[in-house]
UniProtKB/Swiss-Prot annotation:
Source organism superkingdom: Eukaryota
Similarity comment: Belongs to the frog skin active peptide (FSAP) family. Ocellatin subfamily.
Function: Has hemolytic activity against human erythrocytes and antibacterial activity against the Gram-negative bacterium E.coli.
Name recorded for this polypeptide: Ocellatin-2
Amino acid sequence: GVLDIFKDAAKQILAHAAEQI
């Protein structure tokens, strides 16, 4: 569902943020 897509996007954003730290 839409929430699943949002969750996947959030996970990717957090993953990229973690790499920058």
